Amino acid sequence: MAGIKALISLSFGGAIGLMFLMLGCALPIYNQYWPLFVLFFYILSPIPYCIARRLVDDTDAMSNACKELAIFLTTGIVVSAFGLPIVFARANLIEWGACALVLTGNTVIFATILGFFLVFGSNDDFSWQQW
């Protein structure tokens, strides 16, 4: 039952984060859809870690370097997702209020992605690797 509660809370967090993103785009005072480009970063952020986790064997000496490279790439993707709305706001493509809403949505979404890997990342019977 604890897994179901975690799954429901993660989906709620994802919905709240996407709501902030859509509010930053669709409110009549902002009405610019440039911030939707951060959706690509949401999709790309877990990919390096998932690939490294599949390829790495814990007994291998290179496994630590591969995992660290995956974490470095993921960090670059996350920083880019936070930087893109700021660049858009500095270039006057979006308003600063929309930038704040998108950054709030980024925080919630990336916390949800991190929570997913913390809850379902273990190698037990309730792992995300079985999906």
UniProtKB/Swiss-Prot annotation:
Subcellular compartments: Membrane
Major localisation: membrane
GO BP annotation list: late endosome to vacuole transport via multivesicular body sorting pathway; negative regulation of growth hormone receptor signaling pathway
Cellular component GO terms held in the UniProt record: endosome; membrane
Keywords tagged on the record: Membrane, Transmembrane, Transmembrane helix
InterPro entries: Vps55/LEPROT
Transmembrane annotation, as ranges: 7-27, 32-52, 69-89, 100-120
Membrane topology classification: Multi-pass membrane protein
Protein's job: Negatively regulates growth hormone (GH) receptor cell surface expression in liver. May play a role in liver resistance to GH during periods of reduced nutrient availability.
Entry similarity comment: Belongs to the OB-RGRP/VPS55 family.
Listed name of the protein: Leptin receptor overlapping transcript-like 1
Species whose genome carries this gene: Bos taurus
Lineage: Eukaryota, Metazoa, Chordata, Craniata, Vertebrata
Gene it is expressed from: LEPROTL1
